[in-house]
Curated annotation (Swiss-Prot):
It is found in: Nucleus; Cytoplasm; Cytoplasm, Cytoskeleton, Microtubule organizing center, Centrosome, Centriole; Cell projection, Cilium. Disulfide bonds: none annotated. One of its GO terms (molecular function) is GTP binding. GTP binds at residues 143-149. GO terms for cellular component: centriole; cilium; cytoplasm; cytosol; microtubule; nucleoplasm. This is Tubulin delta chain. Found in a complex with TEDC1, TEDC2, TUBE1 and TUBD1. SMART domains: Tubulin (SM00864). One of its GO terms (biological process) is microtubule cytoskeleton organization.
């Protein structure tokens, strides 16, 4: 089944390009470690999900590009065409000459209604090209104006017009030190609106990806392109084909539906994270070998201790003994030592994958008490390697991973709101103080729900 990607704003369009580039590069990789027949099935499954095809055989991304300034979209169109491997559709873009100035209200209340019909028409045409449509993958930031404000508006429209189709938003969490002075306002407005209209929020923290680039990839001068390539690698390792549960020879048809079914059992809990292992530079890779036991041991401890990468894992954190209250029931003011999960999905790719033992992820102590481990954990596999790694593992988790960052953003936004700082920039475009209060209430409930797991 096909997925239509909606790229919103500078951030969404730059990441979207890297995702499509990573997907196609991987599907054409010769390091697959599997037979030609399997490789062809893998390529066909990838193309069905993310690409249509021109008469001349060039893959065209199933994507809609939206921005209020033309510069970034033009760059991405050009880069895709120059790759010679794939390109964007000729009529798949919508851009204007005026940005949103990092103002969420302007993106949501001005650009959204003004351009709603044009944007939704382009999306409709892209959906109509799909023989079998699964849903939308929406890539956006949450701190700026276009990606976040217009992104929330477009997602709401998709929910209204495609209520039976799945919607997953991939959201970039801003740097803690701040790129935009009103980023906390923009963030709470984005998250609270998406919580009402999206089926799942796949969140990536800029700070965590930056550390992966610096410490694991050994990149000295880290650019946004470096960060976006790590993000694209993580997303590709989630969405590339894996075998279905019924067969080791057929790839699953509906990755979005399967992800939602396994990871979002309750609408109160929609926040998903991705952890990927290994991450390393080409130079280090040549001298490193991996075992499934080693990779999965690291990945499990990353989950338990809420580590974003394999370096610097706290190995002193353990699940609570049965019968004892979990440490995570402590108040937010104390450290959340143990990361309780609602649901986890492990995706394994590479050599000898059938021998990998995932029993450690079935431990009932890892999960909330209201879901049985048999329902809370799932594993997907394929012996086809991903990217440059002979063996790789991905953990997609619905857990308490973002409780502290979310609580901090809500707290910072509340402090600004209490002093009425910058509120006039929002009210003049129709976002009233009541809208802020609704957002605070909504997200405080999300924090409380995750804390009480």
């Amino acid at each position: 089944m096909s997925i239509v990607t909606v790229q919103l704003g500078q951030c969404g369009n730059q990441i979207g390009f890297e995702v499509f580039d990573a997907l196609l590069s991987d599907s054409h990789s010769s390091q697959g470690l599997c037979s030609m027949r399997e490789n062809e099935a893998y390529q066909a499954s990838c193309k069905e999900r993310f690409f249509s095809e021109e008469e001349n055989g060039v893959p065209i991304a199933r994507a809609v590009l939206v921005d209020m300034e033309p510069k970034v979209i033009n760059q991405m169109l050009s880069k895709a065409a120059q790759s010679g491997q794939w390109k964007y559709g000729q009529h798949a873009c919508f851009c204007q000459k005026q940005g949103s100035g990092n103002n969420w209200a302007y993106g949501y209340s001005v650009h959204g209604p003004r351009h709603e019909e044009s944007i939704m028409n382009i999306i409709r045409k892209e959906v109509e090209k799909c023989d079998s449509f699964s849903g939308f993958f929406i890539i956006m930031s949450m701190a700026g104006g276009t990606g976040s404000g217009l992104g929330a508006f477009v997602t709401q429209n998709l929910e209204d017009q495609y209520s039976n189709s799945l919607k997953m938003n991939q959201i970039i969490w801003p740097y803690g030190t701040g790129e935009v002075i009103v980023q906390n306002y923009n963030s709470i407005l984005t998250l609270s609106h998406l919580y009402r209209s999206s089926d799942a929020l796949l969140l990536h923290e800029n700070d965590a990806i930056h550390k992966i680039c610096a410490k694991l990839m050994n990149i000295k001068q880290i650019s946004f392109s470096d960060i976006n390539q790590v993000l694209a690698h993580q997303l590709g390792s989630v969405f590339q084909p894996t075998y279905s549960a019924e067969s080791s020879f057929h790839y699953r048809r509906n990755p979005l539906g399967d992800l939602m079914e396994h990871l979002v059992p309750h609408p109160e809990f929609k926040m998903l994270s991705v952890r990927n292992i290994p991450h390393m530079s080409e130079n280090s890779l040549a001298y490193t070998t991996f075992t499934w036991a080693g990779l999965l041991k690291h990945l499990r401890q990353m989950l338990i201790s809420n580590a974003k990468m394999e370096e610097g894992i706290d190995r002193h954190v353990w699940p609570p003994l049965s019968g004892l209250p979990p440490l995570s029931k402590m108040s937010l003011n104390k450290d959340l030592h143990f990361n309780t999960s609602i649901a986890n999905l492990v995706i394994l790719r590479g050599k000898d994958v059938q021998s990998a033992d995932v029993e450690g992820f079935k431990d009932p102590a890892l999960y909330t008490s209201w879901l049985k481990p048999v329902n809370a954990f799932n594993v997907w596999k394929t012996q086809r390697a991903f990217s440059k790694y002979e063996k790789s593992a991905v953990l997609v988790s619905n857990s308490q991973f973002l409780v502290k960052p979310l609580d901090m953003i809500v707290g910072k936004a509340w402090n600004m709101f209490a002093s009425k700082a910058y509120i006039h920039q929002y009210t003049k475009f129709g976002i009233e103080e009541e809208d802020f209060l609704d957002s605070f209430t909504s997200l405080e409930q999300v924090v409380a729900s995750y804390c009480n797991l």
